[in-house]
Amino acid sequence: MSGRGKAVSKTRAKAKTRSSRAGLQFPVGRVHRLLRKGNYAHRVGAGAPVYLAAVLEYLTAEILELAGNAARDNKKSRIIPRHLQLAVRNDEELNKLLGGVTIAQGGVLPNIQAVLLPKKSSGGVSTSGKKSSQQSQEY
């Protein structure tokens, strides 16, 4: 008997996304679609979007962690573009990676050149035993 007369109900397994199979939060399917539509190559392998999504997720997590630390240092509970800028520019590798990137509303790193800083005075007594003859520039 071929069993054509019996109605066998096959329960289809619940669809599992490629992101969940890879243990990622970033969408593997969307990355795959963007790779195909972007005219980067004629064909895109099955592992390429998984790898790219994992790399993007890692970089995002790294930047967000550093930006969260910058926000906490400034006693803020919300990350703003300034915190992203501080996070990226204070990290050597991220700064090299994102060297040509401008972050809108990010500002600049506080930096004063060493030659512009005031000279350190030597306690007021010179080597000859007399008091230093430096006068203030206030008139």
Swiss-Prot record:
Stretches that traverse the bilayer: none
One of the record's GO cellular component terms: chromosome
Residues the record lists as Phosphoserine modifications: 2, 136
Modified residues (Phosphotyrosine): 139
Positions of post-translational N-acetylserine modification: 2
Domain notes: The [ST]-Q motif constitutes a recognition sequence for kinases from the PI3/PI4-kinase family.
Family label: Belongs to the histone H2A family.
Designated name of the protein: Histone H2AX
Organism of this sequence: Xenopus laevis
Phylogenetic lineage: Eukaryota, Metazoa, Chordata, Craniata, Vertebrata
